[in-house]
Regions:
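Perimembrane helix-loop-helix junctions
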Residues: 76-109
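Membrane-interface transmembrane helices that cradle and orient dolichyl/undecaprenyl
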Residues: 35-55
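Membrane-interface anchor segments at the N-terminal boundary of transmembrane helices
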Residues: 189-273
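Short acidic/glycine- and proline-prone juxtamembrane loop motifs at membrane-interface regions
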Residues: 19-30
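Membrane-proximal stem/loop segments at transmembrane-domain junctions that anchor or position
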Residues: 117-215
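Short helix- or helix-capping micro-motifs
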Residues: 4-15, 39, 63, 67
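Transmembrane-helix signature of polytopic, membrane-embedded enzymes
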Residues: 1-13, 31-32, 260-264
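Membrane-interface alpha helices of multi-pass inner-membrane proteins
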Residues: 54-70, 80-81, 99, 103-104, ...
Length: 321
């Protein structure tokens, strides 16, 4: 109960979410799916075999619909799979894998048949499609942020001209030119940009020629007179939650608590998101659909955080005597 209350308190003070609700984009549209998948996974652990079948199907639907909005949702399914393999729960792993993969395949085949038979020409779609490695390539130039030059580079080649091979060659050339030190510096820059801004980029949507100016624009738009106050507060809350999360992770390493072990896949998910974003285009919005996962991980760190604070206080007292 105390964890639930603490999570609500953290959420209540995280004002950036009040504005993100109006930003109708894939990041926010997919925000419920990672935590819903994990919720179903936890429920399956205490269910009968018959009930588990229904839950596994729901897990497959959750990942399928979520990944259609934002394909990064699939990271939590991978994390759960790794957790099951580490704990040698091979049967459960196989059942979840079959459920998720089967539903994704059925849905994608059905969706593609419908779209290509009624709305899209397959060859035109191939030509207009932007391959995933485009964003990997973009993440290796400058600070890794969006740049129109890379978009023009990708569009310069037709699908039939082996666009993917041209992009892959450019990726390897950029890695080679950066070298180890350059890659490390870029990783630090991208880490700060991706995880170091508590506004979660909501202003990117509200800065598109608003029809009317309101007092809120003074706070949430970068050119507003109060934006720095808002950004500083939002980022402070964000960093506080990250500190709680890291404290909980440390407590997990130092403890054999079974309750904490159940949450291992959540910490693995955040690590997976971090690794993914190091390879992707730099954008502070791209982890926001996993913000609820970070909240849960941070909430679990409150006990360990208080314990560390009390121990530090005692050490300071002893040092002053």
């Amino acid at each position: 109960m105390k964890y639930a209350v603490f999570a609500l308190v953290l959420f209540g003070f995280s004002v950036q979410f009040y504005f993100l609700g109006g930003a109708v984009y894939t990041d926010m549209l997919s925000v419920m799916f990672p935590v819903l998948f994990f919720y179903l996974y936890l429920n399956s652990k205490e269910q009968s075999e018959k009930r588990k079948i229904i839950t596994y199907i729901l897990m497959g639907l959750t990942i399928t619909i979520g990944s259609l909005n934002k394909f990064t949702v699939i990271i939590i399914a991978i994390a759960v799979g790794i957790d099951l393999l580490i704990n040698r729960k091979f049967k459960e792993f196989a059942k979840i894998l079959v459920s998720v993969v089967s539903i994704m395949m059925i849905f994608n085949v059905t969706f593609n048949l419908y779209m290509y038979s009624s709305h899209l020409d397959r060859q035109t779609a191939k030509g207009e499609n932007t391959p995933y490695n485009h964003w990997v390539m973009m993440g290796l130039k400058g600070d890794g942020v969006y740049n129109p030059e890379d978009y023009e580079f990708t569009r310069k080649y037709d699908y039939d001209e082996n666009r993917n091979s041209k992009i892959n060659k450019e990726i390897f050339d950029r890695i080679k030119n950066l070298g180890f030190c350059g890659i490390f510096d870029l990783a630090m820059t991208k880490s700060t940009a991706d995880f170091g801004n508590g506004t979660y980029g909501a202003e990117d949507f509200y800065n598109c020629n608003p029809q009317t100016d309101t007092k809120l624009h003074d706070w949430i738009l970068p050119e507003g007179k109060n934006y720095k106050k808002y950004a500083t507060y939002a980022t402070s809350m964000h960093i506080a939650i990250l500190i709680f999360m890291l404290t909980a992770a440390w407590g997990f390493v130092c403890s054999d608590d079974e309750k904490r072990k159940k949450m291992f896949s959540l910490y693995l998910t955040i690590f997976g998101v971090y690794l993914f974003l190091l390879c992707w285009e730099t954008n502070r919005r791209y982890f926001s659909n996993f913000a609820p996962v970070i909240f849960i991980c941070g909430t679990l760190g409150i006990d360990k955080f208080i314990e560390v604070c009390l121990k530090t206080k005692e050490k300071i007292k002893c040092g002053l005597k």
